[in-house]
A protein has these predicted regions:
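PRPP-associated nucleotide enzymes
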Residues: 1-175
Length: 175
């Protein structure tokens, strides 16, 4: 299956989880083996010189772990606060109404690691920005950011470009 056909499997659910939201449901894409492979192969094509693949909880894990498997690379889970059992570092980021925190194990990456960072959605850039900060604090270099979906009209891309002008950001779908 080609990438364009795979992306057509994403369905929009209007007014979910609340009125005015157009939720992008990726479960039909995930359920189709050929489509899922097409997406992970496309993501893997951006790996270049990466030594690790990092994924952001929760749906970023799905794609990042599959890409890591395909490339025979390590996978780094970046999780919400309180979900990792060992020593962690954390990074908080702003939300529309409040804040949230991401964590990663202190020994998850080695200094000098080259990280391909994957998430499912790029919206405001807050979550991805926090993940980049975590990688930088551990001495890793984020070589590329990938998102399956980018929400048009939100400042995510501009926010990331302003703060991290040397990190390319690629989204497969902008809606």
């Amino acid at each position: 299956m080609n990438i364009d056909d795979a992306l057509l499997l994403i369905r929009e659910i209007p007014d979910y989880p609340k009125p005015g939201i157009r939720f992008q449901d990726i479960t039909p894409l995930l359920a189709d083996g050929e489509a899922f492979v097409a997406i992970t192969e496309k993501f893997a094509s951006y790996a270049d010189s990466s030594t690790l693949i990092a994924g952001i909880e929760a749906r970023g894990f799905i794609f990042a772990s599959a890409v890591a498997n395909q490339l025979h690379s390590g996978f780094v889970p970046i999780r919400k606060a309180g979900k990792l059992p060992h020593n962690t570092i954390s990074e908080s980021y702003g939300l529309e109404y409040g804040s949230d925190t991401l964590e990663v194990h202190v020994d998850a990456v080695s200094k000098g690691s080259k990280v391909l960072l994957i998430d499912d959605v790029l919206a405001t850039g807050g979550t991805i920005g926090a993940a980049i900060e975590l990688m930088h604090r551990l001495g890793a270099e984020v070589i590329h950011v990938l998102a399956l979906l980018e929400i048009d009209g939100l400042p995510g891309r501009a926010t990331l470009a302003a703060k991290y002008p040397n990190i390319p950001v690629t989204s497969l779908v902008v809606s």
